[in-house]
Amino acid sequence: MAKKVTGYLKLQVPAGAANPSPPIGPALGQRGLNIMEFCKAFNAQTQKIEKNTPIPVVITIYADRSFTFEMKTPPMSFFLKQAAKVQSGSKTPGRDSAGKVTKAQVREIAEKKMKDLNCDTVEAAMKMVEGSARSMGLEVAG
């Protein structure tokens, strides 16, 4: 018989840097989960990923206080900032440009994010990436 799910918890944790300090410790602790068990398992799974890459995680919490977690791909803004080689987006998107990304870079990001996006084609995913780029104040060049 399947375990009874009591809830889900969404966190964004830097790769290889999960530790019991806030925000991870309190979020897991108040739900009665073993914090160190999560930290060790997460850090083991993110060994091959570049350090401090933000990884969204969905933790499924069961009635017996056990858990499983699923890692997603890093946020689109992370990939866009890397591609444009900027630290942050524009403070006034639409007026000031923070940088540029090419269509090839947009396609590459769309292909990486495809499994986490709610679209069927790469072209639809590219439109989502372009929209995110524009909202960050990045220009999409030819």
From Swiss-Prot:
Which Pfam families did the record assign? Ribosomal_L11, Ribosomal_L11_N
| GO CC annotations on file | cytosolic large ribosomal subunit
What GO terms are given for molecular function?
large ribosomal subunit rRNA binding; structural constituent of ribosome
Which superkingdom is the protein from? Answer: Bacteria
Which CDD domains does the UniProt entry name for this protein?
Ribosomal_L11 (cd00349)
Could you describe the subunit structure of this protein?
A: Part of the ribosomal stalk of the 50S ribosomal subunit. Interacts with L10 and the large rRNA to form the base of the stalk. L10 forms an elongated spine to which L12 dimers bind in a sequential fashion forming a multimeric L10(L12)X complex.
What the protein does comes down to: Forms part of the ribosomal stalk which helps the ribosome interact with GTP-bound translation factors.
HAMAP family assigned to the protein according to its UniProt record, in alphabetical order: Ribosomal_uL11
Q: What is this protein called?
A: Large ribosomal subunit protein uL11
Name the species this protein comes from: Afipia carboxidovorans (strain ATCC 49405 / DSM 1227 / KCTC 32145 / OM5)
Q: Which gene encodes it?
A: rplK
